[in-house]
Amino acid sequence: MNQALKELRDRGLMSQSFGNLEEVFSTPQTFYIGFDPTADSLGVHHLIGLIAAKILQTHGHRPIILVGGATCAIGDPSGKSEERKAISMETVFHNVEKVKEQIGKIVDFSSAAPNAAILVNNYDWYKDYKFLDFIRDVGKKITVNYLMAKENVRKRLEREGSGISFQEFSYGLLQGYVFVHLYNHYGCRVQIAGQDNLGNMVTGQDLLHKMQGADDVCGITWELATCADGRKFGKTEGNTVWLDKEKTTPYEFYQFWLNQSDEDSERFIKMFTLIPLEEIAKLVEEHKANPSARVLQKELAKYMTCMVHSEEEYNKAVEASNILFGKSTTEDLANIDEPTFLAVMKGVNKVEVPKDDIMNGINVIDMAVLHNKVTSKSDARKLIKGNGFSINKSKVVDDKMTVNSEMLIDGKYLLLQKGKKEYTLVVAK
């Protein structure tokens, strides 16, 4: 089997396909993968496609990264129970610029090699394609019955009280024609995409056959990632895990991968990383010999954080993890940036105190009872006497100590700790 295709299959990145893949991939090919820039960041679920593209690029094939500036404005009805809200072209252009930077961290645009990736925006040709010309050139090649039989359209029509606008109905035709354009202008013969995009891929294949007489094109899809327990992949506590660190901090990103189950980690480390499969097999053996060491989760979290962010951000995330779960120090707390600190504290009990009170000084006993697990002043004194109470990771040994503004982290926070793992965050307002 062709080595590029074998690696995709072995990593779980190939489910269904069409065309003669072995014959086509016997020589270097140009292939494309598309992203509709509906947000100003890609999510972790997009990484599957980028890794698949990187694998093919590593084997000598040229990726076209297609951003759907035009199709994004129309809206893909796949998996949607109602029509998506319209996105302005200004927002689309902004989103394109943002995701371009993220994609460039994984696929290689800068290489002088003939298979350096290129980025194409379908808005660049659709903006000048007149409606009457498109209907005449493309619309007459595909019947309404054909489009209505597509699963994404059919499900919307079958849903009671629902329907589909002509705008969304046209999405499959616009998306299918993308393949024709890339075939004509770049010699692109292969599309890769998630399984949910198979219908649009086949439309592109059919249009190529009818418009160009092309029978030498192929498509590859992968199953959408899901967690073993049935949870939707790519979300934590109901929120999307983004690649943009302003939307999901590197610490939260690191924790997302670190908290995967054993079963999911074994699958995901193949799907989302480029770690050689032989090395992964050894990691799996090591993990099974000592599951509590969480070897797979740690390696997965390290690789993903370094790839999407940087080694520096990975090291910061590890240090931040030690705040609540390890032996960090007051100095460690002071060195962590505020967004990371707040991400670590997301689930910690919080209490607000007037900043003026802290500026004037508060007795440590009065401060200690602000902790939700410290029941009284006498309880606070016992904790301090028994070395069981800390502020900012420093043990409190004097129950007459005064807490003042010099102790504030970033000029506004105090971390109160009872015992080893019970925390309250004081926020000076």
PLM features: residue spans?
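Conserved nucleotide- and phosphate/pyrophosphate-binding catalytic cores
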Residues: 208-429
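NTP-dependent nucleotidyl-transfer catalytic core
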Residues: 1-197, 202-205, 212-218, 231
